[in-house]
């Protein structure tokens, strides 16, 4: 920075605004842009707080569980499973934030065609990575739970449901970032408000019918409805190619289904050979099943060239090495 100090000063002189901005005006602008980001990115924590504050109060009213059983359930899905799925959720956040500068730059100069392209590609990339990651984690939920905690069928079941919720949560996060990169902060905050309201309304009913999995399903419904609201607004604002996005989601879901089948068969075979209750054996099972799953998904998406569309033309080199057309 010291070496380039002169050049930076010249750039600052050239970029000086025609009218001076006061210190408080700058602070206000920073707060106006930053606060919505902080609020919306806290959605995961807000939903977790709702579960922590309401679940045990609702347990004796809407379920047949005792107070102690309620405490155990909230530990299983609110803490144990939540820590594991954060690995997958971080993928959604990294995908969403990667396109922010590019999308904001094109939107600021009113380049509508590039805005539509970036949004469609970002959603396609989200599906390409997030859906198989969530499906894969659901398949290996038993051994991966055993790696971190003591074997528990209920904990494994709640982890599977949490993995399903990850997809809806990831979509919610992706659309909030898309909206905020286009300065649609109010819409993103409204979507968060809808999420909280729907979560509170659905929580008792889902707990009554589904017990411990109820809060997770309520969260999934809330995130899904809020995502539809945001998607409608983004579609109206940019007219991005929704058919293209849905087509990519369909291709990813089919490839993920094939991956799930091969992974489940592999896990079944491993369980016939050795028990996976111990942490080391569970870790070996996760690694082997993960390897089979990644290979299956990778080969399918290379074959139908979905990988090329999502990850770039350089992926074609892998296909040539594998002698795939």
Give names to the regions the model predicted.
Residues 175-183, 231-248, 275-276:
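Alpha-helical transmembrane segments
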Residues 1-9, 15, 26, 118-138, ...:
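Short alpha-helical transmembrane segments in multi-pass integral membrane proteins
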Residues 73-163, 167:
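Specific pore-lining/lateral-gate transmembrane helices of multi-pass inner-membrane transport
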């Amino acid at each position: 920075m010291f070496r380039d100090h002169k050049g930076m000063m010249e750039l600052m002189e050239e970029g000086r605004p025609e009218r001076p901005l006061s210190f408080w005006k700058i602070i206000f602008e920073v707060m106006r842009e930053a606060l919505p980001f902080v609020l919306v990115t806290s959605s995961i924590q807000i939903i977790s707080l709702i579960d922590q504050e309401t679940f045990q109060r609702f347990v004796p009213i809407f379920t047949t569980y005792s107070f102690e059983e309620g405490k155990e359930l909230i530990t299983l899905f609110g803490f144990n499973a939540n820590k594991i799925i954060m690995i997958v959720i971080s993928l959604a956040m990294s995908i969403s934030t990667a396109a922010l500068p590019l999308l904001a730059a094109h939107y600021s100069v009113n380049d509508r065609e590039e805005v539509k392209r970036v949004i469609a590609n970002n959603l396609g990339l989200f599906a390409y990575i997030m859906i198989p990651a969530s499906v894969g984690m659901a398949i290996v939920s038993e051994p991966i739970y055993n790696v971190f905690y003591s074997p528990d069928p209920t904990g494994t079941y709640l982890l599977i449901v949490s993995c399903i919720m990850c997809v809806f949560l990831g979509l919610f996060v992706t659309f909030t970032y898309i909206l905020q990169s286009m300065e649609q902060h109010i819409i993103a905050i409204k979507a968060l408000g809808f999420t909280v309201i729907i979560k509170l309304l659905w929580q008792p009913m889902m707990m009554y019918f589904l017990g411990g999995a109820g809060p997770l399903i309520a969260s999934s419904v809330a995130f899904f409805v809020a995502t539809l609201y945001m998607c409608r607004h983004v579609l109206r604002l940019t007219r991005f190619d929704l058919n293209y996005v849905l087509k990519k989601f369909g291709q990813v879901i089919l490839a993920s289904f094939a991956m799930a089948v091969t992974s489940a068969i592999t896990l079944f075979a491993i369980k016939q050979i050795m028990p996976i209750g111990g942490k080391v054996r569970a870790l070996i099972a996760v690694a082997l099943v993960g390897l089979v799953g990644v290979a299956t998904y990778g080969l399918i998406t290379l074959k139908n060239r979905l990988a090329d569309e999502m990850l770039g033309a350089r992926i074609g080199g892998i296909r040539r090495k594998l002698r795939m057309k």
